[in-house]
Amino acid sequence: MLDYIRKLLESNIEKQAHANTTLLVVGLGNRCITSDSLGPLVVDGLEVDYHIQTGQGRDGRMCAVIPGVMADTGLETADIIRGIAKQVKPSAVIAIDALAARNISRLNTTIQLSDRGINPGSGVGNHRVGINKDNIGVPVLALGVPTVIDAFTIAVDLVSPLLKNCTKEEREEFLSRIYMEGISDMYVTPKAIDTDVQNISGVISEALNQVLHI
């Protein structure tokens, strides 16, 4: 699994930056909430070297930051990252975040990569300013893992096989009744999330370390 992720990262990072350039890794999420702590935990495991200098100048390729959440800082995460990017001038940003799944089978089993950036909080209805090239000023590679799922999605996954003989109208009416119960505001996570998020973050950290320190 580590080798597979490393190859995915290599191919995507090459699109975002040339060799011997600086990359800024951003650990999004709330460290105090286990299911949302993926980003900070990944940054904890990184071998940052941007601060290392030799007689020939700066040799390090990777720097990292954990910007926290708006409830703690009062600031849009995108504004924090943009300010750092203006100072550091990275070739690209790698943003890591926990996601909301749209299928039970993808919980803690899927690592998603995108070169279009990310919108923090959008999976749970807490829309914030997007972290993308337009807002940050440099290309943004987003890396996420689904760690939570809303109760309505679980209900749909479970009852859909039972409704296969119903008409489209009947299915929509049944599902709308479930939705009106308010379960779409409930989010759940696997009971082994503590172990899962530690293992997943370790794999991602090591993959990034291998890619950026070749």
Where are these regions (language model features)?
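Predominant activation on well-ordered alpha-helical scaffold segments within soluble catalytic domains
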Residues: 6, 10, 40-47, 82, ...
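A structural signal for small-residue-enriched, beta-sheet-centric alpha/beta enzyme cores
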Residues: 65-66, 95-214
